[in-house]
Amino acid sequence: NTNSPYTRYGYGDLSDQSFGNSKAMGGIAFGLRDGAQINPLNPASYTAIDSLTFIFEGGVSLQNMNISGGGVKLNAKNSSFDYLAMQFRLHPRIAMSIGLLPFSNVGYSVSDTQTATDPGTGATADYARNYTGDGGLHQLYAGLGVKVLKNLSVGVNASYFWGDINRTRVVYYPSVSGAYNYNHQSIASVSSYKLD
């Protein structure tokens, strides 16, 4: 979950794709190769696991956010599922990892009030705008790492993405009777894949 007005754009707040050990080191992941951790950002690192090891790892995130602007202050506390993954050896030179993790999160509710002026009569009317959104994208991946030479491994991840992002925009005139209100809702349903 998230409470950020910046998630109004694009896919929302992109999730950190690194796992526990990498996050503890500031998000570094591409150069890490360790047989005791899962590193989906470097699928070649899967081959570091030994034949007697099976890794099952999960994570959650806690977030405390302070937002201020225009004299308004907001404190938001969020918790969310981070990832669930496993890694194991298939062959002395081949290892595999499978996992589920969020790709992006959308969550916002922003309102403001403006004044509109009729250019013909000069009459004014207040109107309010509300922007809300929720949802996000999820990622399921399966990756293979192959040890080609003693000091050379290659790897690939195949990922499937799915999810919905709902956005609503409402404009209404609370002080004008008989005024037409504007309501627009968009739902983006995503179903796609990638190789990396």
Predicted features and spans:
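Subset of outer-membrane beta-barrel
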Residues: N1-D196
